[in-house]
Structure formats: C-alpha cells, structure tokens
C-alpha cells in the first residue's frame, strides 16, 4: 500500500456560500466511503491564510504565507496504486466541486512509514 495526499487550493471552491452545507455533506460521504473501504488515513480542511505563521530556519516567526497558492484542505489515503488514488481524487473532485491534486507521499523506513 502507498499513501497519497489528495488536496485542493484554498481558492478552488467557487460555489455560492449557501451551497457549502451540501458540498460538505457530499465530501463527508466520500470520506465515509474511504473509511469503510479501509483506505482513509486522515482528512481535514485548513483555516484561512490570514491565520498562517511562517517559521524561518533561524526561528524567526512572521505572519502570512510566503506563496500565492494555498492549500485549502487535504486527505491522505493508503491505497494499492496510483490509479486507485486518482479514482478517489475524482470522487472528491465531484463532491467538493473543485479540482484535486494527487501526490504520492514519500515513505521513510527510518520513521516507520
């Protein structure tokens, strides 16, 4: 099994605010399906970028992100193939009404993954 990060950009969800409950329920339904299939590891949305802190290598802390694109939410799945990760991402894309990025998570036996 291989872990994949499925994520979307913060600005990708462009539907009207009153549709958020329906979109959230659709996303939760896909998450429950992933849990039932035994492939779900973690999922969560992220707070707005105005709450971001950046810690530099010297320990200096500044407010705000350093980039123009921001992750809005993520799901980590443990699936047997990239093809299956792409299938789950397609389901999340429909549920969330926005494109999903799929990236394989590097494994590191030294830390047990």
Residue ranges and their predicted role:
Residues 1-113:
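Conserved, structured core segments of small domains
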